[in-house]
Amino acid sequence: MSLWFLVFLSVLQGVTELFPVSSLGHTLLVPALFGMHIDKHAPQLLPFLVALHLGTALALLWYFRARWIALISGFFAQLGGRKNDDGHLMWALIIGTIPTGIVGLLLEKRLERVFHDLRIVAVALIINGVLLWVGDRIQRSRAHQAPEKMTFKQAFFVGLAQIGALIPGFSRSGLTMIAGNVAGLTAEKAAEFSFLLGTPIIFAAGVLELPKLFHARDQLMDALLGGVLTAIAAYLSVRFLMRYFEGRGRLASFGVYCVIAGVFFLGWFMLHPQPV
């Protein structure tokens, strides 16, 4: 892997994993646009992808470190019989993680193979954009509540939304923000809940494949560099997004981008078919 391509993929992963625009979709579509094919199941690529996921997860953990300390403290306090908002939210995050954890382990590889037709990925990106616009409209028309007041049923519903992101073209953060809007969260709080909810999933995606990173010693330096670059890109992305939504930023803006990008990619790959 050339240095510039390593840098390109690392930054692309760090940004699109958190922006509601589908990291997997962009990882497939953008390189193919420039004539580069990425086999996500190639043995030599696995250590690199492990490092990218770990870099993203570490960036999220660092950005929300104070929040996680409060959540974990509240969780153990609640186990000790002292009810509190942080403990309740921690339970909500645990419940929200369950659907994707189970379905991801069972179906992720199968879903990725089925949807590697880039034209289908482009269509999924367009649908993702429409859903972001709908979610924005819902958020602006509903009464709002704090994440700590979410019911466990609502948390499970938000967790279910993550399953859609197993299909390339749909965004994990985007779908969970939309579900958070439906549950009555503001744009800012829906984004925060989405990032907190996604951290264990992203971290687990890296940890489960961690042995492959250490078995590929000849690729360790590339993987480490990719992980560091992804962590930096992810940290800057989450900081930007939280400020964006705090300043009344809207999901609809990302929806417009996804529709335009999806239409462009669909047209391009209709004219320039790629091997599936």
Curated annotation (Swiss-Prot):
Disulfide bonds: none annotated. GO terms for molecular function: undecaprenyl-diphosphatase activity. It comes from the Bacteria. It holds the Pfam family BacA. It is found in: Cell inner membrane. InterPro entries: UppP. Keywords: Antibiotic resistance, Cell inner membrane, Cell membrane, Cell shape, Cell wall biogenesis/degradation, Hydrolase, Membrane, Peptidoglycan synthesis, Transmembrane, Transmembrane helix. The chain crosses the membrane at residues 1-21, 44-64, 87-107, 114-134, 150-170, 190-210, 220-240, 251-271. It catalyses: di-trans,octa-cis-undecaprenyl diphosphate + H2O = di-trans,octa-cis-undecaprenyl phosphate + phosphate + H(+). Its EC number is 3.6.1.27. GO terms for cellular component: plasma membrane. GO terms for biological process: cell wall organization; peptidoglycan biosynthetic process; regulation of cell shape; response to antibiotic. It is a multi-pass membrane protein. It is an enzyme of class 3 (hydrolase). Belongs to the UppP family. Catalyzes the dephosphorylation of undecaprenyl diphosphate (UPP). Confers resistance to bacitracin. Bacitracin is thought to be involved in the inhibition of peptidoglycan synthesis by sequestering undecaprenyl diphosphate, thereby reducing the pool of lipid carrier available. HAMAP family: Undec_diphosphatase. This is Undecaprenyl-diphosphatase 2. The lineage of its organism: Bacteria, Pseudomonadati, Pseudomonadota, Betaproteobacteria, Burkholderiales.
